[in-house]
Amino acid sequence: MITVVKRNGRIEPLDITKIQKYTKDATDNLEGVSQSELEVDARLQFRDKITTEEIQQTLIKTAVDKIDIDTPNWSFVASRLFLYDLYHKVSGFTGYRHLKEYFENAEEKGRILKGFKEKFDLEFLNSQIKPERDFQFNYLGIKTLYDRYLLKDANNHPIELPQHMFMSIAMFLAQNEQEPNKIALEFYEVLSKFEAMCATPTLANARTTKHQLSSCYIGSTPDNIEGIFDSYKEMALLSKYGGGIGWDFSLVRSIGSYIDGHKNASAGTIPFLKIANDVAIAVDQLGTRKGAIAVYLEIWHIDVMEFIDLRKNSGDERRRAHDLFPALWVCDLFLKRVLEDAMWTLFDPYECKDLTELYGQDFEKRYLEYEKDPKIIKEYINAKDLWKKILMNYFEAGLPFLAFKDNANRCNPNAHAGIIRSSNLCTEIFQNTAPNHYYMQIEYTDGAIEFFEEKELVTTDSNITKCANKLTSTDILKGKPIYIATKVAKDGQTAVCNLASINLSKINTEEDIKRVVPIMVRLLDNVIDLNFYPNRKVKATNLQNRAIGLGVMGEAQMLAEHQIAWGSKEHLEKIDALMEQISYHAIDTSANLAKEKGVYKDFENSEWSKGIFPIDKANNEALKLTEKGLFNHACDWQGLREKVKSNGMRNGYLMAIAPTSSISILVGTTQTIEPIYKKKWFEENLSGLIPVVVPNLNVETWNFYTSAYDIDAKDLIKAAAVRQKWIDQGQSINVFLRIENASGKTLHDIYTLAWKLGLKSTYYLRSESPSIDEKSVLDRSVECFNCQ
């Protein structure tokens, strides 16, 4: 006779009827699974004095091992079994305690921020919780929720159930609304039904004592030692609280440049990037993973050749940074020179720093002037040779990422207020940034303080005229001896990404988009005000432009369920129609919020203020892909233009399509805008390998789930170009190639097409060998956790 050790330590005979209750509930109303098969295969692994915990884990593992292409519903069986165990751990029974009990327990354990639950009617909201929505999770989804998002106590014991998590997030983000109960319920309904989802930092941290809700940050480094090391401090603080980082180093003078009038004194950008690499390692993200920093460099910078080799395994290790993610900021003129097989001139930003402030025709005019100036230090390289080197590295290592400077800035709705200098780690965010500006602070012996620009000419009492940054304590100004002269910073701009994604597999009709998009735009706008900011600068920037990034996920599932082939005319027309609706309702909601809560500070003179929307600045070649005339749009764009001119806009930036692997897994849909990798693969987890099958795989969808490696990469680019027409920021776009199909010409054609069609960036180049491994594990080690 087999005996069982219960959770309280008591030993009693195995009662199979108790197991049957769980297995029946776990298999009910699911096709292709069998209660008896689950019980028989699990019992083969039972032993005397097995614990109830071990029985539960055995049942779960038995179900997981049965997940396959022809039996995908075993994933839901495993999920239900996991949930029953989770209920017992959190509640002590199969069900939910009252919302008030949940809050009091989590507050007592120091896991939930005190003070916001009192703004709500807990009885009402508790009555609106829908425990049955837990059964939407497949196994990998509920495991991901448990491992990454559910709150746990100091002993790593779970104290939160899924619907309590969604409700508490909704409440946290609705706490400042005039009707908090109504808005919290709207947020809860959308999140808990998987119609849309916040990005990882918001899911993990909203409701907690450290409510850092933003995904990543984008900044820029000035060309002085104070500014460079201030940048490291800023990166460290941002990384400490879990933010991914994109950082522009294009202003830092090149190797061989002048320092204090001495030529060949500078070691260039690479040694400073090496320190940034060490920051990424030393300041890990809350002890869970090393920091993630993408570094950007303009393609005319003299250090560009070394920059491309930044992660090479060969060469001088002192000039390598293996943990950074290099990205090139590519201007139109360079790619024109590539196509013309012309020479490309590299400059030192110490002499040509205004090139970082210009784009388009203004950039080209100034660049040509510098080329003709004999006094300017320059180097020459054949543009095509440099392009080949970039593409070769891209193929071998998936890096450097490419971002197109002119495409980004031409479509910047806030070009009046600055310039876009780089993107973020995942290359979908495009916002104005600016490095810190440094002044000379002159403190006199009497305690008085005066400020000068660094290069401002100052005449001392000795009748000597010098730059303010050369003043010392030996100087006297207007009869006042100088006590000390120090360089101080005035904050620049560090941009912030606040992200969420609409689930296209559930929300793909005009009616649903009109309902869900306004809720998510409001939710993201509230993130800005309720966020914990690691420093003053990022808060000031975020409150200045109130940038959000609403994106989409589940495109491949939506296409398969509508029986639309990837890359087909129907595909382009479908996403064109969907993105038009999403763009329209996002802009409309921001205009409504502007009337309700006020406009963002930089609205005046923005493109929005002139009634100019992303579609109005869309790439001409991209417009031809769907052959939709100016008057064939489904939405009342002219009416919306007048509304925006009248109301203003709440948000300076609105839309961006991020990679969504974590939240896509959570809600059981396909990742972001990408095709699938395979119909079945394995995800690596703390519990081992978990088999995963694409969602809703059946006879009707089978032929419409096509691997990304079996789709022409140019079709991926064209689909991205259609989406981009409606987006004010960008998209995280991976390119997929089978190794046997890769060539220099193929890569050239793909990336020049991306540029010509108006894309702002490309992310990883992923290559795969033709051999198919049935046990293939999807490598997510290179993915940005925060944008997901």
Report residues per predicted region:
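Conserved oxyanion/phosphate-binding beta-strand-loop segments in alpha/beta enzyme cores
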Residues: 128-144, 148, 176-210, 236, ...
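A structural-propensity feature for long, helix-poor, extended segments
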Residues: 36-48, 52, 254-293, 486, ...
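A glycine-rich phosphate-binding loop feature that marks nucleotide/adenosyl-phosphate handling sites
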Residues: 41-42, 60-63, 78-84, 190, ...
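Internal maturation/activation junctions in enzymes
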Residues: 201, 517-539, 564-660, 731-732, ...
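Core structural elements
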Residues: 50, 65, 137-152, 191-205, ...
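Active-site cavity-forming subdomains of large catalytic enzyme subunits
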Residues: 85, 89-132, 214-491, 495-501, ...
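Core nucleic-acid recognition elements
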Residues: 10, 33-167, 182-188
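Catalytic alpha/beta core of large soluble enzyme barrels
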Residues: 118-124, 130-144, 430-431, 524, ...
